[in-house]
Amino acid sequence: LTVPLADFFGTTDETGTFHTNIPAPILFCLVMLCVGTIAFFIYTFYDRKLDASLDAEGLEPEEPFRMKDIVYIITNKGFWLIALLCVLFYSAVFPFIKYAADLMVQKYNVDPKLAGTIPGLLPIGAIVLTPLFGSLYDRIGKGATLMVIGSIMLIFVHTMFALPILNVWWFATVIMIILGFAFSLVPSAMWPSVPKIIPEKQLGTAYALIFWVQNWGLMGVPLLIGWVLNSYCKGPVVEGAQTYDY
């Protein structure tokens, strides 16, 4: 979506040279962030309203947060298994998506205007597949097995993208669809596994700590990818643009 937006709002100068409008996709993202912020405040308002109604009805309030909850959670070996799976899994997906459009152009010779279409299949597919896999988990259980299958699929996908074979758009599309299955399969079994190892009264703290660990990975892995590209994968400059050998 980024490149089409930049091209749609681009301009042509007096010499006939076309210039993309970089601020357009940035503004679009800003609008989405604002919508998300407004939604957060609306949620907070209704959450406080619910707490007030529970107090008025004389219901017992939720047990307050205590620092020893953190100690209990971080000393739970099962928590760290889930947290490490989370950080490694999402660090192998989200930073990859950031570079995926450029990968489509550099390796699979996809038109830059369409390069975001193939990676865009991932979130679209997740919308459909995640509820289906969640329903499957509810029926058969076996969360560990489902997570292992999804992780193996993810390893297979990155291996196929790394190998110099079938550098054509349809192959990239097939591999991206498989990544969509893995991206939906692992979370649908991973997140419901947390209540199995953490008491309900500490679930909020556990999820917060998992996201804290995850964000460290999402901060470091893109830096690592960028460093590897700049250090070992630079190709020739073509028409003023740096190319990379993925």
List the model feature ranges, each with a label.
Residues 129-142, 229:
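Helix-to-loop junctions at the C-terminal end of transmembrane segments
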Residues 143-193:
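C-terminal transmembrane helical hairpin of 12-TM major facilitator-type secondary transporters
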Residues 200-234:
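A late C-terminal transmembrane helix in Major Facilitator Superfamily
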